[in-house]
Amino acid sequence: MLFTLGWASLAAMFSFSIAMVVWGRNGDGTLNF
């Protein structure tokens, strides 16, 4: 259970970072970090 939860959170963080990179290269500008 704990291993599955950790793996799911790791995959979520990885996909989120990929999405941030894609949005950054897109030059959307709605999210200003």
From Swiss-Prot:
<keyword id="KW-0812">Transmembrane</keyword>
<keyword id="KW-1133">Transmembrane helix</keyword>
<dbReference type="GO" id="GO:0009512">
    <property type="term" value="C:cytochrome b6f complex"/>
</dbReference>
<comment type="function">
    <text>Component of the cytochrome b6-f complex, which mediates electron transfer between photosystem II (PSII) and photosystem I (PSI), cyclic electron flow around PSI, and state transitions.</text>
</comment>
<dbReference type="GO" id="GO:0017004">
    <property type="term" value="P:cytochrome complex assembly"/>
</dbReference>
<dbReference type="InterPro" id="IPR005497">
    <property type="entry name" value="Cytochrome_b6-f_cplx_su8"/>
</dbReference>
<keyword id="KW-0793">Thylakoid</keyword>
<keyword id="KW-0602">Photosynthesis</keyword>
<dbReference type="Pfam" id="PF03742">
    <property type="entry name" value="PetN"/>
</dbReference>
<dbReference type="GO" id="GO:0031676">
    <property type="term" value="C:plasma membrane-derived thylakoid membrane"/>
</dbReference>
<keyword id="KW-0249">Electron transport</keyword>
<keyword id="KW-0472">Membrane</keyword>
<dbReference type="GO" id="GO:0015979">
    <property type="term" value="P:photosynthesis"/>
</dbReference>
<dbReference type="InterPro" id="IPR036143">
    <property type="entry name" value="Cytochr_b6-f_cplx_su8_sf"/>
</dbReference>
<dbReference type="GO" id="GO:0045158">
    <property type="term" value="F:electron transporter, transferring electrons within cytochrome b6/f complex of photosystem II activity"/>
</dbReference>
<protein>
    <recommendedName>
        <fullName>Cytochrome b6-f complex subunit 8</fullName>
    </recommendedName>
</protein>
<keyword id="KW-0813">Transport</keyword>
<feature type="transmembrane region" description="Helical">
    <location>
        <begin position="2"/>
        <end position="22"/>
    </location>
</feature>
<comment type="subunit">
    <text>The 4 large subunits of the cytochrome b6-f complex are cytochrome b6, subunit IV (17 kDa polypeptide, PetD), cytochrome f and the Rieske protein, while the 4 small subunits are PetG, PetL, PetM and PetN. The complex functions as a dimer.</text>
</comment>
<comment type="similarity">
    <text>Belongs to the PetN family.</text>
</comment>
